Amino acid sequence: MAKLIALVRRNWLFFLLVTIAGLALRLFFVFRYPHVAGDTWVYGDIAKNWLDHGIFGLTDNGAVRPTLIRLPGYPGFLAAMFAVFGREHYTAVMIAQALIDTNTCLVFAAVALELTNTRAAKAAYLLAELCPFTASYTAAPLSETLAICCVSHALYYGVRGVKALEHDAPAGKLWGIAGLWSAAGIFMRPDNGLILPAMGLALLVIFFRKPNKKHVAFACLILAITSLGPLVPWTVRNWRVFHVWQPLASRYANDPGEFLPRGFNHWVKTWMVDFVSVEEVYWKVSGEPIDPQQLPERAFDTRPEYEKTLAVIARYNQQLYIDPEMDAEFEEIARLREEHNPLRYVIWLPFLRTADMWLRPRTELLDVETRWWEFSQHEKESWFALFWAGLNLFYILAALRGWLVSRLGIAGVFVISFILLRSFFLSSLENPEPRYMLECFPVVLALAGAAFIRVRDAVKQFSNQSS
């Protein structure tokens, strides 16, 4: 990162002031809006058992049993923090995440510097440090902050690797580092592996454009070894312990042998498009009752289907778990809905899920009602959520403009395909959560920085013409 270090030295006061502001914002979230709940306890339980018993597992009725529902990246981070600061010292974890995320913003700037120029890098750094959406997740002991850090580094070294190959220069070292950071990102969240096909696409373009194909082939080999090689011990462990082939983590956070309500998951996938339904329905199963009044109209196609669905939900509310017979009924309803309108299931619903993950107000960690559009119920919270959504839209539109006005070359193929691949994959999930798109923000903020430079150039040109 010699170019970035040189830029920081030339503009040390700017970077110092922005860094202080960014760290202050993150510490504000840590101490004002800490969010220690949900998956935090799962990660924490695994970390403690790993430390205390040497078992990567969960506590079940007082005993520790091995698990594969989470990859070892974030539990390993928590275990290290617990070993230094004490068990379940989540405040120390969140402060560490605030420091890590503040530093990660420099990598955002480095990506912008490689894609465009120094002014774009400075603008991207300012936008990144003051971005409340990534900053707020430092106040949650979840994998997002470290996942963003790993993906940012993988993007940076991948962009540098692409540029080196474009100039027919050896790039094995750069692609090796990119692969290691990609592996680290996968260990935080398995969907971060989507960066690898984006890298592969860029390498494929270079392979067919450049005469020196040996450099490209060697880069592909190094990338494959460094990104997938670290997964081998985890895969072997899962085979030895569970006798299953699982190089990542189970899709539905279930261990081998546990009952999985596939029919229920299929049913919600035929209508669920927004985060509020995830909170009110998806996360309730199993253990909490479902309020049928909170189901949207799109969850039903016919009156008989409506009555059958409510009857199944009523039975679930009596026992608060889904048994195989009930799951089969959900599957039958889902199958009929899919047959009734296959295009809705394949095209329209995935599109709406993607739109919700990108555009809804990112207030899920704040004390703001999820049903933000119900102004009559909570007017102040709704106006705040609307402002938050506007700020999110501002970042996205700025990134879109930055992409359109910049000449990114094959590096652009890499970063844009990463966003498109991630969006396409996540649209196939039945539970759209806004946090799933945060790993795209290194690209969003880097391109947004380029947009501001173009605006500044236009203002200067207009001023010169006026004078």
Language-model regions, residue ranges each:
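Short helix- or helix-capping micro-motifs
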Residues: 22-25, 124-132, 153-156, 182-186
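Transmembrane-helix motifs of polytopic, lipid-linked glycan transferases
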Residues: 95-116, 153, 157, 397-401
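Short acidic/glycine- and proline-prone juxtamembrane loop motifs at membrane-interface regions
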Residues: 36-37, 133, 139-146, 191
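Membrane-interface anchor segments at the N-terminal boundary of transmembrane helices
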Residues: 91-92, 319-320, 328-332, 336-419
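Transmembrane-helix signature of polytopic, membrane-embedded enzymes
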Residues: 8, 12, 92, 103-130, ...
